[in-house]
Amino acid sequence: MLTYASGLQDNGWSYAFSVSTRQGGNSYVNGVYYNAFGYFAAVEKQFNSQHRLALSILGAPTERGAQQASTQEVYDLVGNNYYNPNWGWLNGKRVNARVRSYHEPITMLNYTFDINDRSQLNVATSVRFGQNGYSALTWYGGPDPRPDYYRYLPSFYNNTYVGAQLYEAWMGNTNNIRHINWDNLYHINQSQEENPTYGAGHRAINMIEERHADQIDWNLYTQFSHIFRDNSKINGGLNLRRNRTEYYSEVKDLLGGDYWVDVDKFAERDMGGMNPILYQNNMEYYDKYGHAQAVKKGDKYSYDYYGNIINARAWAQYSRNFGNFGVNLGGE
């Protein structure tokens, strides 16, 4: 961590900044890592004995690989409870399918008015914005890519030759059976036949998506305080909040494929593929072109909608001491 603060200068200005990082690699749980940075900067101007204005900015861009729970059968096979099915080897490196990444910086502006030695007014506003995503494997029609899928475990083939072979493979991690086979996922995608409906290229049936909850959060806070001559005190204020959160899924990595067809695979399965209208995610695109959209890296797909919050709150509090006793009244 590196921090510096100037203190109050003769011209009324003061400023401070700080930067830091936190790094973590493979430890008890394979495939889990932590890369985070933090920053803070603030500047304040004291115009005179009554008026002060301060601006602050802070944030912490972070990326971390996640662990996922498995079954007791798998923990027994690998010999510990630290097993993580989210990762596999690709080009000699550990690659985790589930990664949490976020960066939501906050900007704050604060004004202080010392009206007199008994009264003060504070007005502050802040904005928080940025991205918050969580990646995961998804697939369409092909074999389940999760290494600990129940059909890939010995118990599914109990008391059979296949079950015995799987048991030995899991015990010895033969061909990295405990991990995601990234090479195979690339091979499956690149082996798909081209479909002229969606243009040139291979349709990905395995990919990594990233599910987002991206916020814009605005707050306004005002507070007035006054001390009466009998030392009783009154505080009051008004708080306003406006939040808009966009929820959507994004194509993060096509794993060697060229596009992903944006349909609801569960609705398509349940409807038997009979009426394509019933399993479209984007009806506007379907109505215009007559087929599902072929989305590529960075495109939104599956769902995209907003959640909105508007809050307003006013409050007041009165307090007074009578010797060893005190009275407090408040409401909002």
Residue ranges: model-predicted function:
Residues 16, 107, 217, 254-255:
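Short acidic-glycine motifs
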Residues 1-24, 28-67, 106-115:
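Transmembrane beta-barrel wall of Gram-negative outer-membrane proteins
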Residues 15-19, 55-57, 123-125, 236-238, ...:
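Membrane-embedded beta-strand positions of outer-membrane beta-barrel proteins
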Residues 16, 40, 315, 330-332:
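Short, cationic motifs built from Arg/Lys/His that form the positively charged side of catalytic pockets
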Residues 5, 324, 329-332:
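Short, intrinsically disordered, charge-balanced linker/junction segments flanking boundaries
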Residues 248-309, 313-319:
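Glycine- and small hydrophobic-enriched segments that form the cores of compact globular domains
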Residues 44-46, 52-112, 133-210, 275-295:
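Acidic/polar loop-and-plug regions of large Gram-negative outer-membrane beta-barrel proteins
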